[in-house]
Design a protein with these regions (language model features):
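Active-site-proximal loop->helix
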Residues: 40, 65-68, 95, 112-124
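N-terminal beta-loop-helix "entrance" segment that forms/cooperates
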Residues: 52-74
Length: 185
């Protein structure tokens, strides 16, 4: 990602600095943290404060309940929950809160992440989890920012700049590839 002209975390309309985490990241084990680095990279780039917690739906259900209560009290706007294997954490969180939950299924285990993906996308009626692709931590960060942009105008502008940058990168790649193709013809 390229740096852009946004230098502060202030909301453009109000001028207030956002001092609380807007995004919470939940992961069931420290072993999975390295697969989520891109979330932090994206949120830092867009100047969105976040926090991360180790929460396991099956191994620490009481902690999961406390975690959700705390997030609601803090005013967190989006939760990103990751998991591998049965990956019940995103669904459990979604069943206990009205805060939007983004699920990130992680590769691993016998089915190489397919069980995680299916667990997240097959949620029952009324308990949605916005599920990303396997190991799509980057897209989870972007999607969280898009949700936040509905409330925080500075993010909408930053996302527009980011999309323009993606477009420019494709154009640059096309020019380079076309040039190399002509040289080898």
């Amino acid at each position: 990602m390229k740096k852009d002209s946004f230098a502060t975390t202030k909301e453009r309309d109000s001028g207030k600095t956002i001092k609380r985490p807007l995004v919470a990241i939940a992961v069931p084990s420290t072993k999975l943290l390295s697969q989520l680095n891109e979330i932090k990279t994206v949120l830092d780039f867009f100047q969105v404060l976040s926090e991360i917690s180790i929460v396991a739906a099956h191994r620490s259900p009481k902690k999961t309940l406390r975690f959700i209560d705390e997030l609601e009290r803090k005013g967190v706007n989006v939760i990103i929950a990751a998991g591998s294997g049965s990956a019940h954490l995103p669904g459990m969180i979604a069943s206990l809160t009205t805060i939007p939950v983004i699920g990130v299924p992680l590769r691993g285990g016998t089915l190489d992440g397919m069980d995680s993906l299916l667990s997240m996308i097959q949620m029952p009626h009324g308990v949605p989890v916005g599920t990303m692709g396997l190991n799509s931590a980057y897209n989870a960060g972007i999607f969280a920012c898009q949700i936040l942009a509905l409330k925080y105008p500075y993010l909408k502008e930053k996302l527009k700049v980011h999309k323009e940058t993606l477009e420019e990168e494709v154009e640059d790649e096309d020019r380079l590839q076309s040039s190399e193709w002509r040289q080898h013809s």
